[in-house]
């Protein structure tokens, strides 16, 4: 007898609910169809469902996301870095308390005491006809952040090696839910032939028909749930083995919306708006925001960052603020709207030479006009860099490009060999936006505060009537 086993999955929604009601309708329909046919079917999420960029996620600290997943009927989920490092310890500890699905993450640990009751290292599920399926999941080890929040992520390869032998002995099939990224997924497939399926996320890769590496089929469905993934396994009960593994992703953006989900989203948005409608200050004058110009609010915010982190200098890009603020009542919702990024303050150590190179790079048209989506940045462009504690003099070339002619502190040039503590947005410590910052061997992150928390303090101190 041949038995088909079905998995449907989502990954990296990032609280982008544009297509969520379509996702809900598609998944509920698929599950109902398989239940009618008496076929085994599970719904999975691979992490980063929560992202505090959205007011619903911000107001409910992720709890509304769990309600939405319950409504769809998810069976299993794992933790992404956006759940893991953007929520305070207590909020994450209780995030899944009301989940009607099992949460699996074998390398996630609480360093402050007992583990959350919802946390499973592995899970075993069973098909209608008795095929035992072992589920293991891992999340990306951003311990520089996690440890500041009272969590620890153990090394992925060591964790897999620890649990995979046990699963191999007790189950027929092993499914790995990976919030590690495509490169890690491929390497894990090469190292661990025991894995049959790797369902991935984190790096927002889209594999339309899956990819076979060693013994595993690897799959992932991009980001924001424009696609939903499906894995179909065929088990031969006579031969007692898998004889076929298939993986597909389906574009759901053209499908009809599930009206019940639409109503729930509207209800949650109204409630979130009410919760965020808490007055922060009253402003007598409107606040001007410009991405490519020096503004008072960006200068004040950069000054606050310098003082708050006790750094010698500070730098922030003007693109962090997305919109103007009118005169009158300013709520936390307004602050979230103009500064929605899950970005934390950070202090790095740079030599005088390195800092000057960073400053020069920041004034290039290429960086200022860079369209960025990622590293926590949820805006449009990087914009002009604003400095505190430094005087940066620039001139314009005949071609219209601006260049840095002089950098001083209290009228004196920077010592090229001296190390300075520079406060900035943590997004510059990732990737290659500003290589000197990314390569700094000394990085101190501040959690759970976001830059918008410093913005609220700045507005209270400098702009309140």
Language-model features: where?
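Residues in well-ordered beta-strands of folded domains
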Residues: 104, 219, 316, 393-395, ...
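A short C-terminal boundary segment appended to hydrolase-like catalytic domains
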Residues: 237-330, 462-464
């Amino acid at each position: 007898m041949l038995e088909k086993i079905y998995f449907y999955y989502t990954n990296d929604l990032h609280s982008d609910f544009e297509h969520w009601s379509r996702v809900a309708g598609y998944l509920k329909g698929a599950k109902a169809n398989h239940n009618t046919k008496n076929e085994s079917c599970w719904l999975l999420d691979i992490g980063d469902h929560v992202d505090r960029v959205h007011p619903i996620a911000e107001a409910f600290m992720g709890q509304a996301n769990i309600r939405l997943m319950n409504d769809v009927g998810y069976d299993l989920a794992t933790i992404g870095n956006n759940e893991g490092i953007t929520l305070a310890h207590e909020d994450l500890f209780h995030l899944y308390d009301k989940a009607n699905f099992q949460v699996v993450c074998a390398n996630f640990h609480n360093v402050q005491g007992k583990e959350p009751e919802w946390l499973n290292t592995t899970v075993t599920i069973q098909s209608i006809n008795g095929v035992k399926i072992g589920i293991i999941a891992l999340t990306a080890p951003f311990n520089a952040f996690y440890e500041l929040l009272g969590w620890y992520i153990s090394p992925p390869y060591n964790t897999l090696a620890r649990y995979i032998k046990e699963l191999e002995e007790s189950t027929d099939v092993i499914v790995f839910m990976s919030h590690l990224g495509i490169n890690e997924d491929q390497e894990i497939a090469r190292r661990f032939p025991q894995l049959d399926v790797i369902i991935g996320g984190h790096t927002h890769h889209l594999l339309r028909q899956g990819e076979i590496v060693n013994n595993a089929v690897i799959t992932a469905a991009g980001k924001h749930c424009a696609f939903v993934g499906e894995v179909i396994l065929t088990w031969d009960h006579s031969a007692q083995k898998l004889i076929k593994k298939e993986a597909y992703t389906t574009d759901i953006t053209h499908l009809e919306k599930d009206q019940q989900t639409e109503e729930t989203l509207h209800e949650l948005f109204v409630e979130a708006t009410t919760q965020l409608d808490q007055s922060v200050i009253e402003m007598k004058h409107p606040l001007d925001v410009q991405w490519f110009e020096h503004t008072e609010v960006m200068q004040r915010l950069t000054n606050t960052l310098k003082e708050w982190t006790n750094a010698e200098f500070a730098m922030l890009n003007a693109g962090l603020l997305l919109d103007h603020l009118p005169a009158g009542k300013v709520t936390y919702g307004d602050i979230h709207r103009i500064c929605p990024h899950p970005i934390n303050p950070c202090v790095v150590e740079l030599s005088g030479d390195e800092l000057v190179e960073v400053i020069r790079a920041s004034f290039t048209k290429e960086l200022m006009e860079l369209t960025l989506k990622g590293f926590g940045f949820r805006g449009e462009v990087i914009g002009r860099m604003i400095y505190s504690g430094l005087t940066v003099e620039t001139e314009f070339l005949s071609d219209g490009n601006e260049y840095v002619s002089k950098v001083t502190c209290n009228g004196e040039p920077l010592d090229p060999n001296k190390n300075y503590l520079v406060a900035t947005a943590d997004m510059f410590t990732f990737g290659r936006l500003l290589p000197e910052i990314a390569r700094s061997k000394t990085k101190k992150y501040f959690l759970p505060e976001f830059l918008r928390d410093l913005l609220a303090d700045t507005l209270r101190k400098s702009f309140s009537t």
